[in-house]
Amino acid sequence: HLLVGLLYNIEYIAKSKGQAELSPLTHQNDIFQRLISLVNTYSKTERNVSFYANKLCLTPRYLNTVIRQTSQQTVMDWINQSIILEAKVLLKHSNRLVYQISDELNFPNPSFFSKFFKRMTGMTPQEYQKN
């Protein structure tokens, strides 16, 4: 799956940027890798940190702490990145219209999707699709 590969590349980049000190923290790295796997599987439908924390048998606060220590990003950042990567792939490599992509990614409406996409990328879905 393309999205899985992209997220693992992001993880690799995060680890290679001066985070060698994290290698002994195998439990934290394990939690991080399990979170990424869950985000890849469920981010289209589940955008609540509590969902992922429950799947990992952790509290949302502890999960966020571990993920922030491991990657300098929050769980929500990883969820949003996954959604944006999926949206970008669909916008560039499918013939779907924005409202169809919005539906596929389970946004309440195309307007909400467009605002989210613009907030995350700095451009509208239509602008991204054209470039």
Regions found by a protein language model. Name each.
Residues 69-111, 130-131:
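Terminal helix-turn-helix DNA-binding modules in bacterial transcription factors
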Residues 50-51, 62, 100:
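Alpha-helical residues within helix-turn-helix
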Residues 115-131:
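…primarily DNA-binding HTH/wHTH and HhH modules…
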Residues 11-37, 41-51, 55, 69-77, ...:
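Short, Lys/Arg-enriched, Trp-marked, Pro/Gly-tolerant hinge/linker segments that flank
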Residues 54, 58-64:
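Long amphipathic alpha-helical coiled-coil segments
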Residues 1-9, 81-85:
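Short, residue-level hotspots on alpha-helical faces of the histone-fold
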Residues 56, 105-106, 117:
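Core residues of bacterial helix-turn-helix
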Residues 63-64, 112-113, 117:
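Short hydrophobic/aromatic patch on the recognition helix
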